[in-house]
Amino acid sequence: MNILMLSSTFPYPPTRGGTQVRTFNLLKYLSQRHSITLVTQREGDVTDAEVAGLRDCVDHLAIFERPPDSATTGILKKIQRFGKFLQQGTPPSVLNRYSVEMQTWVDNWVEAEKCDVITCEHSVNEIYVRSHFPKQLKTIVNVHSSVYATCRNQLSTGISENSLRDRINLPLLRRYEQNYCAKFSAIVATTEEDKIQLEEFNPNSKITVIPNGVDLVSFPNRTTDPGGHRLIFIGAMDNLANIDAVCFFSNEVLPEIQKLYPDATFDIVGSHPVSEVLALAQKPGINVIGRVPSMVEYLHQSTICVVPMRTGFGIKNKTLEAMAAGVPIVASDRGLEGLAVDGASDPLRALRANKPTEYITAISQLFEQPHLRSELSHNGRQLVETEFTWDIAGKSYEQVCLARSNTNS
């Protein structure tokens, strides 16, 4: 099968962030059995070696320069983009990355009948799929997280960067998500929660849940429990949901933990820490480490991984990676979305916390009880091995690609 994959985010190396991890690993699986053409955009920090590495993974690679960021284009352009959002329904964040050259390339490729399936790796790429494409080939959108649900959640939790803007945007995002989903033969979501949200917009759509996975070679199970009082958070530190998570934890939870355990430390590990995150390093016991060559080494040295997300929909790679590494987890409802960790019929695989007092209780329990750490470590790793590998996700994605489309004529 000839598959055309669209990803405006350059998906290599797969350590850059959640979008890259999911896109690359599904691409890698499909490329073993099918002919893959990838269309992507190159950002300024992408090296020639990374381009070469990605090229080795696909049959054909088409790269376009990423358009300049809207933040540098002035207020007039922003107003024009918002006007388009009101009139046409496409959010500025999607228009911001739109490339006319990339659109022309996609149109020509589809017109020449060079692919059987077109996949959008993250919903932002839906803009390149014309409304008539489903009549010619199968169209799939891989929704990493619902934009409407994410915006609504940011407003309800009070972490929106601009609440006035987002209150105006919310009904527009609902309309946008409903409209773009109608262009696709099949929709893929990462969690049941997102599936329910998308079904509300498109009750007749074929929606398949395919969770994220973990590369078990890159995230081996730890061989020893280091003990101590070392906490860790992992993730891209220019991501709004991650920024909120570490600021919340550093300001409202860690000081109380340090009253009980004065030697407790908190490592923030992940690429591109913004100024707000860098400033946390001034607080006692906090280490802002930035991007590292091996995330798993830092995980193995930690007593507990915390995932104090208050927003951000979809399954969290960071949670799965920590589980794979055998590190006990304390996480919020958002951090545990899509995972059966503490139900009545489930082995205990993580401790759940949403309020500061709940984090303090859960972390203290794990600091004090080596057998509880061992239980979570074993059960978390087992869950990933049986349900959340990229082979499992890849097989499911392949089935979606191969399934006969009702839309095709």
Residue ranges and their predicted role:
Residues 318-321, 328-335:
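Short hydrophobic beta-strand element within catalytic cores of glycosyltransferases
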Residues 138-141, 148, 166-174, 178-221:
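Donor nucleotide-sugar binding/catalytic pocket of nucleotide-sugar-dependent glycosyltransferases
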Residues 185, 285, 297-314, 325-327:
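Acidic donor-binding loop of glycosyltransferase active sites
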Residues 8, 72-95, 139-178, 236:
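Acceptor-binding helix/loop patch of EC 2.4 sugar-transfer enzymes
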Residues 209-284, 288-301:
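Conserved catalytic-core segment of nucleotide-activated headgroup transferases in glycan assembly
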Residues 1-64, 111-113:
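N-terminal subdomain of nucleotide-sugar transferases
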